[in-house]
């Protein structure tokens, strides 16, 4: 005797209602989209009175060698800070993933501690450390290594070092996530086959940690090129970068259209770097050398 079995229809998956995202959309529009559109609007004026539309501000910036030099110095600073953060952050992230569980908590506290303090406080700490009467110069003079204080502050190098320390958590945290997602069996298999620790690192660990490396690099680069406080206090205004240049044009000169154009050009350059790094990440995704 044949029996007919009735298979219940699958219940449609019901996601959260769209209105739950409304507060986030309003926040994004009010504090990101609208200010960005206003910035574009102001930059597209040829005069400070905002009466004549045009692209004269962009042509003025791109046609001046000094302006292009400021842009190039800012991009180079971002690259230096990113490399310094990577060279110090990768060993720290690797140390965290290899540390026993009881040590990971204190290590994580040390990593995120800079994020719990104001950037102004951290920057002033570097001013105290690198000043002519600062900790470094005082220690070197007490040891008899130098006769006169070294000029450590108000240099591009001091700005890069200070920013690398301040932005370090932005590099370390994505690297920790990427390193912890690597299957430990891959390293063990590589070592068992006689690859050695260095070869295993270069062939297995580094390629598989590339997503975290690229994410951290983008965060550090984007944050460092726009770090007005650190660039100004540690640099002393003697070396002009794009954020301080915007401040000069807007506050000191009252040339808001030109300042807005500077901001938009910096944004375009940062977005170009983001697109290029994302393209590199897609090409290198999943590549592990044999």
What residue ranges belong to the model's regions?
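Short, Lys/Arg-rich, polar N-terminal cytosolic tail immediately upstream
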Residues: 1-14
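Short cytosolic juxtamembrane segments of multi-pass membrane proteins
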Residues: 4, 280-290
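Membrane-water interface segments at the C-terminal ends of transmembrane alpha-helices
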Residues: 13-48, 61-180, 204-228, 235, ...
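Glycine-rich helix-loop "coupling/hinge" segments at transmembrane-helix boundaries
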Residues: 47-53, 228-254, 290
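A short amphipathic helical element positioned immediately N-terminal to and/or at the very start
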Residues: 53-62
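Short glycine/proline-centered loop/turn elements that form peptide/ligand docking sites
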Residues: 182-186
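The alpha-helix within a helix-turn-helix
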Residues: 190
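Glycine/proline-centered hinge or cleavage motifs at structural transition points of membrane proteins
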Residues: 193-195, 207
